[in-house]
Regions:
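Donor nucleotide-sugar binding/catalytic pocket of nucleotide-sugar-dependent glycosyltransferases
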Residues: 103, 129-168, 176
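A charged, aromatic-enriched C-terminal amphipathic alpha-helix characteristic of glycosyltransferases
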Residues: 319-353
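Glycosyltransferase donor-sugar binding loop
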Residues: 38-40, 184, 209-223
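Nucleotide-activated donor-binding/catalytic signature segment of Leloir-type glycosyltransferases, i.e.
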Residues: 223-241
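Conserved acidic donor-binding segment of nucleotide-sugar-dependent glycosyltransferases
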Residues: 293, 297-304, 313-319
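Aromatic "clamp/platform" in nucleotide-sugar-dependent glycosyltransferases that forms part
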Residues: 261
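Short hydrophobic beta-strand element within catalytic cores of glycosyltransferases
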Residues: 277-281
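Conserved donor-binding/catalytic core segment of Leloir-type glycosyltransferases
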Residues: 172-202, 212
Length: 358
């Protein structure tokens, strides 16, 4: 679906890969996008001025600048991403007086930030309450947002995988020896990556598995130091690469593995399912909307033995679970193709504009 002339003002972190993908696809489908950001990312954007020493004040003090931009560019839609940050900023700027506001939830803005303090909770709630529509990638996430504030309307739209990358889906489901496991989550406390190494170190040291992690994350140095001491060269680290190259790289693995302590519906897991990997993840609510023990493996958070037993089963039984993997890919094709997900977003934008005009 194309939307010629639809003018969208996106407020988001310009450093984020999710922002890059989102803005690029809106433009590909015919939207004119004006991206404003407090961060200084590589993509083309308008840089909002950061004022004050405290990051939380940056949003407050940028409100006047955003008001000026709204009057100048006259967008059809204002689309903040991350309710507790840019959603709050859009609310302070009175964006709703200029155009309908669609706020995209990113997960931690709802599941983590509000618990930091009363201030964080209230600013998140304010951002939500001043939105015409709130969009999240799981029912769990949207419900959590509704528990924080009265929301005018909401939708669930996943972050899917691009159509072209579905062609990288594995043709051969045979499990490799050693079993190749990829953990494509950055090294942050919430992703609990070192737990995975501790749990699976005996299997790695016996040469039964190979574990691959990204280079990215603020705890990367700490992770490497401790992980190397446990499994040596069975630990593989990959650097950031172009998306198409990474999709091909991920498709070469047998298993997708996550130990996230908090999450909505993980985009990386959906991508892995579309590519034909077997998913294994810690049993948390957002994950359950895509993963159960009928199409992959869930294990109790922090339970090393439970995770180790799942991986041992895969190695010993040598059961590639072909039916699961085909069914997972079909669901992704049906519900989580990125181009279709963005087309749905654009339709919602048109609906809001029409509703305001009527």
């Amino acid at each position: 679906m194309s939307a010629p002339g639809l003018h969208v003002m996106v407020l988001a972190d310009s450093r984020s890969f999710h922002t890059e993908r989102y803005v690029a696809e809106l433009r590909r489908q015919g939207c004119r996008v004006f991206l404003a950001s407090l961060e200084r990312g590589r993509m083309l954007h308008y840089t909002l001025r950061s004022r004050g020493f405290l990051r939380q004040l940056h949003y407050v003090l940028a409100a006047n600048e955003v008001r000026t931009l709204l009057r100048r560019i006259k967008p059809d839609i204002v689309n903040p991403h991350f309710a507790s940050g840019y959603g709050f900023l859009a609310a302070l700027a009175g964006a709703r007086r200029h155009a309908p506001v669609i706020t995209n939830l990113w997960g931690s803005d709802i599941l983590l930030v509000p618990d930091k303090s009363i201030f964080h909770r209230r600013k998140t709630a304010y951002g939500l309450s001043q939105s015409d529509l709130v969009v999240g990638d799981s029912h769990y996430l949207v419900k959590a947002a509704r528990d924080l504030a009265v929301i005018a309307d909401s939708r669930v739209i996943p972050w899917g995988i691009e159509t072209a990358f579905l062609d990288y889906h594995r043709r051969d489901y045979a499990l490799q020896k050693p079993l190749r496991i990829i953990v494509p989550r950055p090294h942050e406390k919430i992703y609990n990556n070192l737990f995975l190494v501790r749990a699976l170190a005996p299997l790695a040291n016996d040469g039964l598995i190979e574990m691959t992690f990204p280079e990215a994350g603020s705890l990367s140095g700490h992770f490497r130091l401790h992980a190397r001491s446990m499994i040596g060269d069975r630990l593989k680290i990959y650097q950031r690469m172009p998306r198409a190259e990474f999709m091909q790289f991920m498709a070469e693995h047998d298993v997708y593995l996550s130990s996230a302590l908090s999450d909505s519906s993980p985009a990386s897991m959906i991508e892995a399912m579309g590519l034909g990997l077997l998913p294994i993840a810690a049993d948390i609510p957002g994950v359950r909307e895509w993963l159960s023990n009928d199409n992959g493996y869930l294990y109790e958070t922090y339970n090393e033995k439970a995770l180790r037993n799942i991986v041992k089963y895969l190695i010993e039984e040598d059961d590639p679970k072909e039916a699961w993997r085909r069914a997972n890919a079909e669901r992704v094709r049906s519900e989580a193709v990125f181009e279709n997900n963005i087309a749905e977003m654009i339709k919602l934008m048109h609906d809001l504009i029409a509703r305001r005009k009527s």
